Amino acid sequence: MTPTAQTTASARRVVFPFTAIVGQEEMKLALLLNVIDPKIGGVMIMGDRGTGKSTTIRALADLLPEIPVVANDPFNSDPSDPDLMSDEVRQKSGTGAEIPIEFKKVQMVDLPLGATEDRVCGTIDIEKALSEGVKAFEPGLLAKANRGILYVDEVNLLDDHLVDVLLDSAASGWNTVEREGISIRHPARFVLVGSGNPEEGELRPQLLDRFGMHAEIHTVKEPALRVQIVEQRSEFDQNPPTFLEKYNPEQTALQKKIVEAQKLLPEVKLDYDLRVKISEVCSELDVDGLRGDIVTNRAAKALTAYEGRTEVTVDDIRRVITLCLRHRLRKDPLESIDSGYKVEKVFARIFGVELLEDDSSQKNGAGQIKTGVR
């Protein structure tokens, strides 16, 4: 670790370790897959209050390894990938000039509910541009979030036009700011994570569809698990350094697994017949557009890479398809069946597999419980 990174690490607040989080496997899987392949398009997490949504997201950001960035660059430009460089860095790179590099933790940027569009996208100093002839740009939160995680708590309460801006940037990987005929563009490739409580209002279907995955979490009902969660939290609060030390081997192992999955991802193959069946499921469920097909393909590949394999199996698809499709189904007020269960039923029929009892148990918040990611 570099001296700069050590200083930053000591200044950071202590975060509950990701591998110590009990249950909520659906949410954890969705977050991990988005980190392995950000092109999945982010994740929307809807669930009850106090179920560990914010804690898990912050824990994930803290878990991720350091990345190389161009020193003193507000956009966290990648020194080796032109698609993730600001214009200034790309010009320097083109002339063969030496680019100073530093290592820093993956950024976790919180977007407050009261944020303005200028604060999110950045602003252009028109006066300076006209008087001095330079593009004076004040970067916003999207610039800071490049190559990191952008977290919006209570996303269902955020202004619709801001949600649109975020989703456009997340999908394209670029943010464009135009004022008075002056245009500035910079990379903004990030994992968009939104969370909310459905009791406080729903997100519009056309915006919900733009999130790659949708995880539903519920309060853990099993008394033994609740006690375990309370005890772990108490242990962490009493002595954070000792608690972190205890989980350090698991954190390091998971971090290594994520890095290896990112490297393995380009080699993962998804058989044509399986791709056809994924599209059959989407067609049968009357999913609008092709986002559902694309995201399910990407998520299945990311899961396969995470498991250390290069061939996608039916089970890989089964584990991700509900996360990728449940929020894309048309809402029928007279329909009593859960949208996730509906996806599972259609999947089981088209892929010719048995509907697992465990799948429906995911609705109780403890589905497919393991103690942490171990």
UniProtKB/Swiss-Prot annotation:
One of its GO terms (biological process) is photosynthesis. GO terms for molecular function: ATP binding; ATP hydrolysis activity; magnesium chelatase activity. It catalyses: protoporphyrin IX + Mg(2+) + ATP + H2O = Mg-protoporphyrin IX + ADP + phosphate + 3 H(+). ATP binds at G47, D48, R49, G50, T51, G52, K53, S54. Pathway: Porphyrin-containing compound metabolism; chlorophyll biosynthesis. It is an enzyme of class 6 (ligase). SUPFAM superfamilies: P-loop containing nucleoside triphosphate hydrolases. Pfam families: AAA_lid_2, Mg_chelatase. Its EC number is 6.6.1.1. InterPro entries: AAA+_ATPase, CHLI-like, ChlI/MoxR_AAA_lid, Mg_chelatase_ATPase-isu, Mg_chelatse_chII-like_cat_dom, P-loop_NTPase. Keywords: ATP-binding, Chlorophyll biosynthesis, Ligase, Nucleotide-binding, Photosynthesis. Belongs to the Mg-chelatase subunits D/I family. Involved in chlorophyll biosynthesis; introduces a magnesium ion into protoporphyrin IX to yield Mg-protoporphyrin IX. This is Magnesium-chelatase subunit ChlI.
